[in-house]
């Protein structure tokens, strides 16, 4: 099983070398040849990764979502893509459609757990979170720094046992 933290760090090292925050997952996706589009989606859908044989994958984001939600959804779909590349399933057809709600974060689906953890580590790398925490930066300021919601930041702080 792939380690989402290591995979996110590899992507950051290779494609986001300037270490500026917030990390822009759309720019990273484009540098990997992925198209990212926004469109009207059903309310229960937050995003999707769609791959047809012989065609580059497309990440679809819900056009009405808040910018921070779109960033996390994009990073999440990128996580699905990275897991496919690493498992050498690059040209097969596949589709991930991510639904909102409690069932999306229960931790029962390994692919979803990987994509969520990858997204969190891409947008909020552990070392930067710890650095800001040591400096006693307020949570809302940290969330702005990373371009995520305060809720996502608190989830990350809790995962690092900093809350």
Model-inferred region functions:
Residues 1-163:
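Active-site hotspot residues in diverse enzymes, especially metal/ion-binding acidic/histidine motifs
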């Amino acid at each position: 099983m792939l380690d989402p933290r290591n995979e996110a760090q590899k992507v950051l090292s290779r494609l986001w070398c300037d270490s500026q925050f917030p990390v822009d997952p759309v720019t990273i996706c484009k540098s990997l040849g992925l198209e990212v589009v926004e469109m009207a989606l059903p309310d229960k859908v937050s995003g999707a990764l769609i791959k047809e044989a012989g065609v580059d994958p497309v990440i679809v984001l819900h056009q009405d979502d808040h910018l921070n939600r779109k960033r996390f959804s994009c990073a999440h779909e990128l996580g699905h893509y990275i897991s496919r590349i690493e498992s050498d399933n690059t040209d097969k057809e596949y589709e991930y459609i991510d639904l909102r709600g409690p069932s999306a974060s229960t931790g029962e689906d390994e692919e979803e757990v990987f994509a969520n953890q990858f997204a969190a580590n891409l947008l909020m790398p552990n070392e930067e979170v710890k650095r800001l925490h040591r400096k006693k930066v307020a949570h809302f300021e940290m969330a702005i720094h990373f371009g995520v919601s305060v809720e996502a930041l608190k989830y990350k702080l809790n995962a690092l046992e900093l809350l």
